[in-house]
Amino acid sequence: MATDFSSIPIIDISPLLAKADDPKMAEDPGVLEVVKQLDKACTEAGFFYVKGHGFPETLLKEVRDVTRRFFELSYEEKAKIKMTPAAGFRGYQRLGENITKGVPDMHEAIDCYREVTKDMYGDLGKVMEGSNQWPQNPPTFKVLMEEYVSLCRDLARKIMRGIALALGGSPNEFEGQRAGDPFWVMRLIGYPGVSSVNGTNVHKNDIGCGAHTDYGLLTLLNQDDDVNALQVRNLSGEWITAPPVPGTFVCNIGDMLKIYSNGLYESTLHRVINNNSKYRVSVVYFYETNFDTAVEPLDTHKTRANGNKEFKRAVYGEHLTGKVLTNFVDL
């Protein structure tokens, strides 16, 4: 239920994190205030910044810097971990290889997924079977990113406990069969900026990433502090800039949470246009449901106050696989 929002709220989630695993968290005034803010943000914009998340700013920067160093390597070096179907669509994509709604995106990226072993999810998971392809250069890459994924997973789980309360359920609503064994996706993305050719500004890229919604439950975006590029569309169709706020994550709602909330929470369209001269790095962590979970509106949201519309059931793994199989060219 998006609105004509003109800015994106900043939420201090430290009171929620302090009590996130307390059986009585729903009775804590500090938690309830955060829950109220989460509910408002998810209902009105589908986007919000979080501060007080516990990640040192030095770690956020290190993750971006290591990613940037990889993208500065030669194509031949980067292609050593080239994405292939045999790797479960994990690895490096060159500029223009990712497709959004049929149009090449002007970014390069490394795609990582929770690793899927043979027959882990039966036929449902065949496409995603494989291990992540981590660069050997920089040498710290694999250890740093695996630690970062673990921290992001824990943070997202705790935010989802607050969102569960906001939806009128128990804090455990998105654990167990829904997201007790969550799948995850991480994209490390580089967006070239504007170059100067013959004294005239020429865009190497038009749309760094075309307008889209995210697939899962909750997204955590760690973006460069000095480049405005992310834009979010409000109900009137206006594109609202989501400028970097140092030390924060940008969070947004995915398609699966929209279904769980029966449309109360919006998986809002967003895009990236880098009109800056600087190369932009973003590291995006996607917290998902269990891979084989059948997602349908929560019992508390099957009858909507403003009508009887109900979102249809979707199996997350099918939803993800369908997107992955149409997102790339020349693979």
Swiss-Prot record:
Reaction(s) the record says it catalyses: L-homoarginine + 2-oxoglutarate + O2 = 6-hydroxy-L-homoarginine + succinate + CO2
Residues that bind Fe cation: 212, 214, 270
Binding site for 2-oxoglutarate: 280
Cellular component GO terms, alphabetical: cytosol
Cofactor: how bound: Binds 1 Fe(2+) ion per subunit.
GO MF, any single term: 2-oxoglutarate-dependent dioxygenase activity
Protein name: Homoarginine-6-hydroxylase 2-ODD-C23
Residue span, Fe2OG dioxygenase domain: 182-289
Keywords noted in UniProt: Cytoplasm, Dioxygenase, Iron, Metal-binding, Oxidoreductase
Pfam families: 2OG-FeII_Oxy (PF03171), DIOX_N (PF14226)
Organism listed in the record: Glycine max
Cofactor(s) needed: Fe(2+)
EC number: 1.14.11.-
InterPro entries: DIOX_N, IPNS-like_FE2OG_OXY, IPNS-like_sf, Iron_ascorbate_oxido_reductase, Oxoglu/Fe-dep_dioxygenase_dom
Subcellular location: Cytoplasm, Cytosol
Stated role: 2-oxoglutarate-dependent dioxygenase catalyzing homoarginine 6-hydroxylation thus producing 6-hydroxy-L-homoarginine. Guanidine (Gd) is in turn synthesized by the spontaneous conversion of 6-hydroxy-L-homoarginine to (S)-2-amino-6-oxohexanoate (RHEA:79843); guanidine is a nitrogen-rich compound that can serve as a defense or signaling substance.
